Each structure stands twice: as structure tokens, then as C-alpha cells.
Amino acid sequence: LRRRQMIPFFRKLEPCLIGMEACGTSHHWGRELSDLGHQVKLMPPVYVKAYVKRGKTDAAGAEAICEAVTRPTMRFVAIKSPEQQSILALHRTRDLLIRQRTQLVNMIRAQLAEFGIVVAKGIQHALRLVGQLVEGAAPDIPALAVKVIVALAEQLSDLQVRIGHLDKELKAWSRDNATVKRLQTIPGIGIVTASALAA
């Protein structure tokens, strides 16, 4: 069954139980099929795997899903709304940018260490030192090396701005969310964790 054939196919069926592994696009299809009146249940793939009886094929996977969805002890995944998926996309993007920021800081520190300059840990220390390089604070570092390090620092500054924008979006979304507010009353749970749990 091709993707474009899914909705017409399920539209013709009487409402029934549909089991799917909770993976890429499953929440979208869960919403679409639920709108047609079907009962959709998403299951973590790791739990479905226990019901696979033979090699990994589409038929064996479908059989395992059919078996797993009828089990009374199966743990199901709630179908996420578009709003919940949006905030999860924000979290994933923020996480990616933070990892890239860490890589850039480490690269700047490593490049400077090659010239005998040790930078204290932290983004601000790296950016401050790069600013001093531009002003000529280390004349023995070749101009080409300074250009390369400055390019990394510019990218780092850009990432800082982007992460700041995502943090503002996260705060704005969380401000009106009762679940996030309730979760934040738990000691040690901040806005990032609370919004991720709420999504």
C-alpha cells in the first residue's frame, strides 16, 4: 500500500482497531486514521519486537504488530497533537544547536591550544579571547589561523542567538500551558524538562 493510497483504503473500511509501531510519521497517521473513526494504538517498537516469530520482513512485522496490539498488558503510546509535535521539534532542534555550539567551542579551544593559548572552559571565555585576537593580542598567530578561528567564533555567536530565540519560544509556549506549570512545582524540574514532559 503506497502512502497516497492509505487514506482512500482506510476510508472504505468499517471502523476497526489499527496497531502501529510508534516511529516516524506514526503520530500523523494515527491522527488521520482516528479522524476516519478507527481506533489507533501506537506501540513502542521494542515491545513489538518480542512478538516477531521469524526473520525481519514486512509480513513478520505486521503479524507481530497484530499480535501485540491485542495483548492486555501492552503499553501504548498516546498519539501526539500537532502542537505537541511542534514543541518536540523545538526541543530536538534546540538540543542539536546546543551540541553544535559545544563542538564549536571545543574546536576553537583546540585551534588556539595549537598555538599555545589555553582558553578557560565556557563560551564567553572563547568569544572574549577571539575578540582579543582580532585586536592583535597574539601577533605570533598567523593571519590565516586568526581568520579561521574568527569564522568559528562568528558561527558560535550565531548559534547563541538562535538558541536564545528557541528559548524564548519555549518560554512563551510554556507560559500558557497548565501541565508545564504543574510540573515546574516539582523540585528540580525547570522549564525545559517540564515542557519536554508535557509534550
Language model region names:
Residues 1-199:
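A detector of single, family-specific signature residues
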